[in-house]
């Protein structure tokens, strides 16, 4: 519907593209974000993110494109359970599932293809919901371009996860070797805020330019971003603009004391030392990337999730084995994803089996999973008891609390207990401002509430970025 833009003191531009109600109902999001070194680039980025989210979520929700089956029943499928398990090898909850059980569980599968174009099937809903660090959704000018962008994204996440988990001390890029005027302008903008910028080589020896930017916003906290590109310049600009973009996120700040290696200057290299994979076409770049991951002992799978109505090429990418960025703060583990998928395909027996066996670290996990299983069995009254108990526990996982408040609030709304419904709504907004859950609690017309909730989200976004909104095209606020 609209785009909202603002300019960071570093000179980078950021955009929030406001989706229509249809976008919201499919993705659960109000907006999509973009950033760039100019207005058009930021606007373009937000619209591409809008397109990729809409296309991918719509594809995964399409039952006509979902095949319910198991590893055992999908004979001669190129994608094996080893490809799935390789990306969660560090997850302790994996021991709760026996290999033969995983082979027999019914899952939702989507048609994909490997690096050679061979048809195969992947449980993409499970991958998209759980393995966030190893799947990439990207839009492009062509399907090959979308595949390149998606593959670069998963390689970025894999590199960052490897650096974080192993505590690797990578080379510092000498800022004197940076000649690009746009990059130098952004860095100077950061310095004008009193921030210090450390640019590091995150390529990990792969023939792919990968740059990490660690920016100290004060002596104790910093922001870290990693980006790749076809050239060192492209990777640097992407990492710098993303670093400015995530500044408004309160949870993106890291402690300097816990990651001192990002500020070490023991080993320096020139940005010219980074590899260059630029080629004449997206297909040539894609072939180079496929060769790179193959030489690293990795397998890559793609899925064309382009929406016919939109007509914008979108691809999902899965890389195995790949390191997954930890999701522990949101309670995501292998069991989390598997139980959710089993409930989606109505395999209550399989979900119940895992639920009984799992010895979760805290009681809130049991209460959450048990409540969701009862919801799937249409035993809402029993489920509500578990959700009420969960809210009484000292639960640190926001998603568990959000879901519990949602079901309790919906129940109160249906019973016309406006006071309790309002209490649950207020609690939801405090946990997650702009959450789509209140749309189901506020009134009988979600379409009307959608507009109100969307405006609330926009105000919160503007409030987060208020310190960086400058005089912009004659208006002393963010441009609509």
For each feature predicted by the language model, list its residue ranges:
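Helix-biased "structured C-terminal domain" signature
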Residues: 1-480
């Amino acid at each position: 519907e609209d785009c909202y833009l603002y300019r960071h003191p570093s000179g980078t531009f950021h955009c929030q593209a406001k989706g229509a109600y249809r976008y919201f109902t499919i993705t659960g999001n109000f907006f999509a974000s973009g950033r760039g070194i100019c207005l058009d680039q930021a606007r373009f980025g937000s619209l591409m993110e809008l397109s990729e989210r809409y296309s991918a979520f719509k594809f995964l929700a399409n039952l006509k494109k979902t095949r319910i089956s198991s590893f055992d029943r999908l004979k001669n499928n190129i994608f094996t359970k080893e490809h799935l398990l390789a990306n969660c090898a560090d997850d302790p909850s994996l021991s709760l599932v026996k290999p033969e059980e995983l082979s027999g569980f019914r899952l939702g599968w989507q048609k994909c293809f490997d690096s050679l174009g061979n048809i195969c099937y992947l449980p993409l809903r499970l991958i998209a919901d759980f393995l966030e660090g190893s799947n990439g959704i990207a839009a492009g000018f062509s399907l090959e371009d979308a595949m390149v962008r998606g593959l670069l994204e998963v390689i970025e996440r894999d590199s960052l996860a490897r650096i974080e988990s192993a505590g690797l001390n990578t080379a510092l890029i000498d800022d004197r070797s940076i000649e690009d005027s746009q990059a130098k302008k952004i860095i100077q903008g950061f310095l004008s805020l009193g921030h210090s910028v450390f640019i590091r080589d995150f390529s990990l020896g792969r023939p792919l330019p990968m740059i990490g930017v660690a920016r100290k916003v004060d002596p104790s906290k910093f922001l870290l971003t990693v980006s790749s590109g076809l050239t060192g310049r492209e990777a640097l600009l992407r990492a710098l603009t993303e670093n400015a973009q995530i500044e408004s996120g309160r949870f993106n700040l890291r402690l300097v004391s816990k990651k001192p290696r990002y500020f070490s200057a023991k080993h320096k290299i020139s940005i010219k030392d980074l590899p260059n994979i630029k080629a004449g076409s997206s297909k040539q770049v894609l072939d180079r990337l496929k060769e790179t991951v193959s030489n690293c002992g990795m397998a890559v799978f793609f899925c064309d999730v382009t929406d016919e109505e939109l007509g914008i090429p979108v691809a999902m990418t899965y890389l195995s084995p790949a390191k997954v960025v930890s999701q522990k703060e949101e309670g995501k583990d292998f069991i989390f994803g598997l139980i959710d998928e089993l409930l989606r395909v109505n395999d209550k027996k399989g979900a119940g089996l895992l639920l009984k066996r799992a010895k979760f670290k805290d009681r809130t996990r049991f209460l959450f999973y048990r409540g969701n299983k009862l919801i799937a069995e249409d035993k809402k009254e029993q489920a509500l008891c578990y959700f009420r108990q969960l809210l009484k526990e000292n639960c640190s996982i926001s998603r568990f609390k959000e879901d519990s408040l949602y079901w309790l609030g919906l129940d109160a709304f249906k019973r016309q207990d406006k006071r309790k419904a309002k209490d649950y709504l207020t609690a939801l907004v405090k946990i997650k401002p702009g959450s789509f859950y209140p749309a189901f609690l506020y009134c009988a017309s979600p379409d009307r509430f959608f507009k109100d909730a969307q405006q609330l989200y926009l105000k919160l976004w503007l409030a987060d970025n208020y310190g960086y909104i400058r005089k912009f095209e004659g208006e002393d606020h963010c441009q609509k």
